[in-house]
A protein has these predicted regions:
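C-terminal region of N-terminal signal peptides and the immediate post-cleavage residues
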Residues: 33-46
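N-terminal secretory signal peptides
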Residues: 1-17, 28-34
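Catalytic beta-strand/loop cores that center a nucleophilic Ser/Cys/Thr
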Residues: 45-46, 156-251
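Twin-arginine (Tat) signal peptide motif
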Residues: 14-23, 38-39
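Helical hinge/lid and interdomain linker segments adjacent to catalytic or ligand-binding clefts
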Residues: 52, 59-140
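A glycine-rich, often tryptophan-bearing local segment used as a flexible ligand/cofactor-contacting loop or short
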Residues: 110-182
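Extracellular ligand-binding/catalytic regions of CAZymes and related secreted enzymes
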Residues: 44-48, 54, 62-65, 69, ...
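Short, solvent-exposed loop/turn segments at secondary-structure junctions
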Residues: 57-58, 109, 137-138, 208-212, ...
């Protein structure tokens, strides 16, 4: 993966490792081959372009490299170009103009500064697409606009990895229409959020809270020397209404978020990779159709309008 400057991964060349190589010895059991739906129809439009951003200033997920490689593979197979970076200086007005959508993939902490945040805000408000994967909800806490991208669904806590039962809430959205009404995930890290986003977004997936243990979690740890969690003020991970994937409009732009994607094994689950592909296609199509490049339009004086 390229970590200093954006690099194209859509051609299959360059330093981005293959998904199978990245898996290595992480999985003991065989994994079914990736089987996805037919490539989306881009209706004769120019090939869309996606920027994948995976910078971390907090916890760093072991699945990041696999996630980026998976998205690169999806782009190659489904007709969109992928550039991957961990360099925040890519976030300029002119730099982002090259893209139809941006995906924050397991980012953590504050990853952008003032002018970079402004560039992201302008990009989305003028019609660009934004997708967030898993700990994208644990990112940019001091950025009010970023909270809008999440429809207010900020990460609160998570328990240890375990099985959990997902509930499909939209049978028509391209990121969930392939899923059964209920979907048992063998092992994953399930986030709880500061509030439910229902009413502020279109909820696509939720989780059946009776199917897994919300407590103890990262903010309500057990006591004793074997405590696996850091010590935070204790809160419950129980939400009652517990969305796990959603989408909504932000200005002229579109946001899509999934709380899944912590475990490396998720990127070898056809149901999840199809879910991820559907979300990326959603924001890419929106960005290609709606995004304004008006700041490059020359004014009467011949200078770019800002």
């Amino acid at each position: 993966m390229c970590t200093d400057t954006p690099c194209s991964g859509s051609t299959g060349s360059g330093p981005t490792p293959s998904r199978r190589a990245l898996l290595g010895a992480a999985l003991a059991a065989p994994v079914a081959p990736l089987v996805l739906s037919a490539p989306p129809t881009w209706a004769g439009i120019e090939r869309p372009r996606l920027l994948v951003f995976s910078r971390t200033t907090g916890f760093r997920h072991m699945s990041i490299e696999t996630a980026v490689a998976t998205i690169t593979d999806l782009g190659a197979a489904h007709g969109f170009d992928v550039d991957a970076t961990e360099d925040p200086t890519a976030f300029t007005h002119r730099g982002l103009d090259a893209y139809d959508a941006i995906a924050f993939v397991n980012t953590t902490g504050d990853v952008l500064e003032g002018a970079q945040r402004t560039a992201l805000k302008r990009f989305v408000r003028r019609g660009g697409g934004w997708a967030g994967v898993h700990s994208a909800a644990d990112t940019e806490y001091s950025n009010p606009f970023y909270t809008r991208l999440l429809a207010g669904g900020r990460f609160l806590a998570h328990p240890l990895e375990q099985p959990g039962l997902m509930v499909t809430e939209s049978a028509t959205h391209r990121s969930t229409r392939h899923l059964p009404e209920q979907w048992l995930i063998p092992i994953e890290e399930f986030y709880s959020f500061t509030s439910s986003v229902r009413g502020r977004s279109r909820v696509l997936l939720s989780i059946d809270e009776s199917s897994y243990l919300q407590d103890p979690n990262t903010s309500n740890p057990p006591t004793g020397p074997e405590n696996p969690f850091p010590t935070y003020p204790g809160v419950s991970g129980v939400m009652g209404d517990h969305p796990m994937a959603w989408t909504h409009r932000v200005g002229r732009g579109r946001s899509w978020y999934t709380a899944l994607g912590h475990e490396i094994t998720m990127y070898y689950d056809d149901r999840f990779t199809q879910h991820l592909l559907g979300g990326l296609v959603t924001v890419l199509k929106h960005g290609r159709k709606h995004r304004s490049r008006s700041y490059l339009t020359l004014s009467v004086e011949g200078r770019p309008r800002r």
